[in-house]
């Protein structure tokens, strides 16, 4: 394999100079060392903020920056580094890393333990004629089928309809995503921002990492998630909880304006939060499977149980009709009982005839229930 670069060892890592850059470009501040490894891959926080749009939302810029990690099959880190674009020769970082007989090709050739390549880019890879980044990445993966590639980005590059190359870039992203599970494409969001800061930004530790997320950054991450899913025709199987219900209701108007205008067109100094709204909206990343979500009713609104109140009219006594009490109701038997009642004159009769009992028949009629007719 013919080497196409020169790697120079430094105290913190290495700097790489491709051989075909025979002269320095006066219009590029990174020439000729566009690839750096180890601690040389760290950048100042100001540069990271301007390039990746963190913690503010993204805004138009022309600089391309890609951090990368090379890991083994057991996920152990073998090498970390960065690649920057060249404004003089108009090369993108992905094109430098994945070109045939390029840097990653040579590194894997000398270290067969590399099984995972992870990219953290401020822009998604493109496939425009001057760069052909996705084509080089695709061919690289065809030569190394045992190597997986995970691409994380902070904004999509030239995929909107106003760009002439948008259809070409979207089609190329679909082709790259078709290599799943060897390839995954995802936006940077949630705790991944803090991990990148700790690994690739200078003078950053766990205590100094900015914890709160700005609402504009959260909205941009959500927009990137659904946009990349629509491009590669993938269904989002997880729902993120980046905003609480209360904050989400407060930011509905901002979200509507966000869809109509470019992402974060104003600089951080120009942004002024409205009164009564906290500009620092905390972000909590929650992955919830659709199977754990409550069922969603589609179509008409499900009927709620109705409460039925029955009104009862009080019955008036004047409305009752009482049947003749002398007549027993039909079907009711009359019981006749014969009893022996002592006569009032028994005392006189006893004198004459010791005792005399008179039979009297007493008819006892059962009580007649009053029949109420409505």
From Swiss-Prot:
Class of this enzyme: hydrolase
Domain CMP/dCMP-type deaminase: 60-176
MF GO annotations: hydrolase activity; metal ion binding
Region named Disordered: 259-280
UniProt keyword list: Hydrolase, Metal-binding, mRNA processing, Zinc
Residues that coordinate or bind Zn(2+): 92, 126, 133
Record: active site: 94
Cofactor: Zn(2+)
Tissue and organ expression note: Predominantly expressed in testis.
Role of this protein: Putative C to U editing enzyme whose physiological substrate is not yet known.
Family per similarity comment: Belongs to the cytidine and deoxycytidylate deaminase family.
Name by which UniProt lists this protein: Putative C->U-editing enzyme APOBEC-4
Species whose genome carries this gene: Mus musculus (Mouse)
